[in-house]
Regions:
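Residues forming the Rossmann-fold NAD(P)(H) cofactor-binding site
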Residues: 14-18, 98, 137
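Conserved glycine-rich Rossmann-like NAD(P)H-binding loop of the short-chain dehydrogenase/reductase
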Residues: 28-36
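Substrate-positioning beta->alpha
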Residues: 100, 164-165, 184-205, 211-212
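Conserved beta-loop-beta element that borders a ligand/cofactor-binding pocket
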Residues: 120, 141-164
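Mid/C-terminal beta-alpha module of Rossmann-like enzyme folds, strongest
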Residues: 2, 200, 204-264, 278-306
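N-terminal Rossmann NAD(P)H-binding glycine-rich loop of SDR-like oxidoreductase domains
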Residues: 4-26
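NAD(P)H-binding glycine-rich loop region in Rossmannoid oxidoreductase-like domains
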Residues: 39-111, 122-125
């Protein structure tokens, strides 16, 4: 891979940090992290070879300046509290996922960048009723129609040493006598190790998968219940599972939506109970990567936590 300067929006987040490390490991890339708070981002990702630049999606001039001299922009932004929106703080899928992508597209074109890489989601669909799936689908369309070379990744549930979902589930299992599964527990999920996603992003920076959209999940398609049993086996904390009806969860979400910093919402219930399956064959054909089986990845994760 020729030496490049890669700008990364969302570089201090869980997925972004893994991408930064993978790009630096290539030895062929200078990484520039776009962030509202460079000091805070540096504290979370203090690695040699990373440049931190102040930029905000609501300030177009700051984005253009931050992208000057870069070759590629990677959009891996997720808002705080994802997937629970907080409209009072402007943390919505429409503003962050869709409008944020459009702002980065405009800035990239003004700054003369040639390549846009987007971390979308497995259920992205511009016609979806869920605001998150719809916003990501609309962002994808904007990217495809931008005239920039692009690669779009649609991951299923992403996990790793620093994720909040799988690690959070493991922490609950450590102390709770039983575990409440959202919905029926039959919703499909295909957990993908964050390092595998980051490896594909690095290959995309070098030109692989150009102008393509690729779903990415692990090699194992499973139900949420089955994933919980794998997490329990890996952590050594087996607990009885019970299922929380969606109707009850939505009622609780409706109440919590009224709080200044809601921990649950009705849309978040839809998000966690939706199928999150992937067709990974196009990705495997194009990128030739060996995806990590869930039992191996989660056993590795459990060891990292000890």
């Amino acid at each position: 891979m020729d030496a490049k300067t890669v700008a990364l929006a969302g570089g201090s987040g869980f997925i972004g940090r893994a991408i930064v490390r993978r790009l630096l490991a290539s030895g062929q890339t200078t990484v520039r992290v776009l962030t509202r708070n460079p000091e805070e981002a540096r504290a979370r990702l203090d690695l040699p070879g990373v440049e931190f630049v102040r930029a905000e999606i609501g300030r177009p001039a700051s984005l253009k300046d931050a992208l000057a001299g870069a070759n590629t922009i990677i959009d891996a932004i997720q808002f705080d509290g994802y997937p629970v929106e907080n409209p009072r703080r402007g943390l919505t899928f429409e503003r962050i996922d869709y409008a944020g992508a459009v702002a980065l597209i405009d800035a990239a074109k003004q700054a003369g960048l040639q390549q846009f890489i987007y971390i979308s989601g497995a259920a992205a669909d511009e016609n979806a009723t869920h605001p998150g799936f719809r916003a990501k689908g609309r962002a994808e369309r904007a990217i495809r129609e931008s005239g920039l070379a692009y690669t779009i990744f649609r991951p299923s549930l992403v996990y790793g040493p620093e994720d909040k979902v799988v690690n959070g589930l493991a922490r609950v299992l450590r102390f709770a006598p039983v575990f409440g599964v959202p919905g029926s527990g039959r919703q499909k999920v295909q957990p993908v190790l964050v390092d595998d996603l980051a490896a594909c992003v690095m290959l995309a920076v070098s030109g692989r998968g150009r102008n393509g959209t690729y779903e990415i999940g692990g090699p194992d398609l499973m139900t949420f219940d089955e994933m919980m049993r794998i997490i329990m086996d890996a952590s050594g904390h087996r607990r009885p599972l019970f299922h929380i009806p969606e109707g009850i969860m939505r009622a609780v979400g409706w109440l919590l939506e009224k709080l200044p910093k809601p921990m649950l919402s009705r849309d978040a219930v839809t998000f966690v109970t939706a199928d999150n399956a992937c067709d990974i064959k196009p990705l495997l054909d194009e990128f030739g990567i060996n995806l990590t089986p869930a039992r191996i990845g989660m056993a590795y994760l459990a060891k990292k936590q000890k």
